[in-house]
Amino acid sequence: MGWLRPGPRPLCPPARASWAFSHRFPSPLAPRRSPTPFFMASLLCCGPKLAACGIVLSAWGVIMLIMLGIFFNVHSAVLIEDVPFTEKDFENGPQNIYNLYEQVSYNCFIAAGLYLLLGGFSFCQVRLNKRKEYMVR
């Protein structure tokens, strides 16, 4: 042990006491590590290829659903087959059909927002994968 050398005895033993002791009571002179890298690495749940695939698919989904939402909002006649109407909706004129068109367009915009959130999650996974490459183990 280092404190058994001849000469004046130090007031406390060296910092190599035990792992359990040093883990619970870190030395005030020891450099502190930020818990951020471990916490950020624990959020990593997709590999780099899956995250890139998620970005591509979500970008395509956002573009397609926004365009569909716009076309439903302007009451495109080509999309009449995709509007969920019944025979009762035709009785009171076209206003009921227009309301159904607008409801489907809102649904498309909501789905585009969900795809945008998925793209943001995939982008975060790509960033975490890149950060993981630079981490030292």
Swiss-Prot record:
Gene Ontology MF terms: RNA endonuclease activity
InterPro entries: Ribonucl_Kappa, RNase_K
EC number(s) given by UniProt: 3.1.-.-
Tissues/organs with expression: Widely expressed.
Membrane-spanning residues: 52-72, 104-124
Topology class, membrane: Multi-pass membrane protein
GO cellular component: clathrin-coated vesicle membrane; endosome membrane; Golgi membrane; lysosomal membrane; membrane; plasma membrane; proton-transporting V-type ATPase complex; vacuolar proton-transporting V-type ATPase, V0 domain
GO BP term, example: lysosomal lumen acidification
Keywords of this entry: Cytoplasmic vesicle, Endocytosis, Endonuclease, Hydrogen ion transport, Hydrolase, Ion transport, Membrane, Nuclease, Transmembrane, Transmembrane helix, Transport
Major enzyme class: hydrolase
Subcellular localization: Endomembrane system; Cytoplasmic vesicle, Clathrin-coated vesicle membrane
Family: Belongs to the RNase K family.
Quaternary structure and interacting proteins, as annotated: Interacts with the proton translocation complex V0 of the V-ATPase. Interacts with ATP6AP1.
Function (record text): Endoribonuclease which preferentially cleaves ApU and ApG phosphodiester bonds. Hydrolyzes UpU bonds at a lower rate. Regulates the activity of vacuolar (H+)-ATPase (V-ATPase) which is responsible for acidifying and maintaining the pH of intracellular compartments. Required at an early stage of receptor-mediated endocytosis.
Protein name, entry field: Ribonuclease kappa
Phylogenetic classification of the source organism: Eukaryota, Metazoa, Chordata, Craniata, Vertebrata
Name of the coding gene: RNASEK
